[in-house]
């Protein structure tokens, strides 16, 4: 984490959330398949690399963590905020069995 980092979290505009929703309900599914299926596959790869079981839910949490770490260096980077919102949406889809 950068020294004396100050992160100001501003109100997230609705358009950012709408963008994340469009991505996970549109191109994301077309490009990567159903949310749960894709994240279970990622978990299998990570499990092999790490030598311990990883769940699809842990993949989502870790990806959010990656985006949060990047925001420590560039807190206004819009794409990271969209991605975080998208991963929250992906987790919601997984909960619904999508």
Describe the residue ranges of each PLM region.
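Intrinsically disordered, low-complexity regulatory regions
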Residues: 1-98
């Amino acid at each position: 984490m950068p020294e004396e980092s100050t992160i100001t979290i501003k109100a997230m505009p609705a358009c950012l959330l709408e963008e994340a929703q469009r991505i996970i309900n549109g191109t994301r599914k077309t490009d990567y398949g159903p949310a749960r299926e894709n994240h279970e596959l990622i978990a299998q790869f990570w499990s092999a690399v790490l030598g311990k079981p990883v769940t699809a839910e842990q993949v989502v949490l870790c990806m959010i963590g990656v985006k949060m770490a990047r925001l420590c260096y560039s807190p206004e980077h819009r794409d990271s905020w969209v991605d975080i919102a998208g991963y929250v949406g992906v987790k919601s889809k997984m909960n619904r069995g999508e």
